[in-house]
């Protein structure tokens, strides 16, 4: 689909579900992303009282470079398994590659989930796109009109160049709040991806690459990253292989004291983690293992794998951000009373052994379930 054709479709959708819609709102959009809200009514209040409406559900949609041949990818900012199931059902509906049909299916399913009647506006999604200058173009600002004229000259640009287009509807740039050196890394990745695409040597999937680029941008602008709690380095510039260094843990924990000693002895003042992502991310979790130092406790298994339900298919949600996963691992190591094993054989941590330990523990927990350790255990 051409840039102008995609833009026309997005404007059509935004004209139906505008920012004041009573049920579903397209808050902002770009050529490769939608930011939407589903408004949930409050439950019936007790007699003589009133309840404030709950916050709206926030949904994101990534539009891939091959749209409409491949379906857009949706995820939701919520841990609610019911909402995750809605998106999984949408993903399983292979015939819904059209953004309009996806929206119709999604809104109807969310209405069923919250026992709401089907909204009449969803029927408008079956209508053909307006032609000419009628309907959706009335609310376009002069800035948007200029962008539209520019778009006509760049219809043949590939996906990665499209992502660099200036945002509309007053939305802040996706790169705002990111330091220059990190912007340079993002730009290098975009250029590499573009060249690989032109050479027919694309690695990974469009879905995973788009989401990982978003996750990396979110990491670079996060306060925890800027405060030096952790750092991220891409191994061989690959979006699918990250080194994450945990520089700061709870200062009252024994692990913090151990890291101070480790710095004095070996010049290492961090815990090095490896995050490995597959083509089906974010629908499957990353594989995470400790690379160094060797730890005891902290739910760290043989080979450096981590015993966390969050990192299994059973406990994972496509809504989870990598930033939150990193911070959860940081907290779990402290909660599990992890300690540095000084003098331990460093070769005992490797990928093959970590995968073996991970697979074994997952099989055990699939049979017996997961549990939360009692407070006296940390």
Swiss-Prot record:
One of its GO terms (biological process) is protein K48-linked ubiquitination. InterPro entries: RWD_dom, UBQ-conjugat_E2_core, UBQ-conjugating_enzyme/RWD. It is an enzyme of class 2 (transferase). Its EC number is 2.3.2.23. Residues 126-152 are annotated as: Disordered. Pfam families: RWD (PF05773), UQ_con (PF00179). Residues 207-371 form the UBC core domain. Pathway: Protein modification; protein ubiquitination. Accepts ubiquitin from the E1 complex and catalyzes its covalent attachment to other proteins. In vitro catalyzes 'Lys-48'-linked polyubiquitination. Belongs to the ubiquitin-conjugating enzyme family. This is Ubiquitin-conjugating enzyme E2 Q2. It comes from Mus musculus.
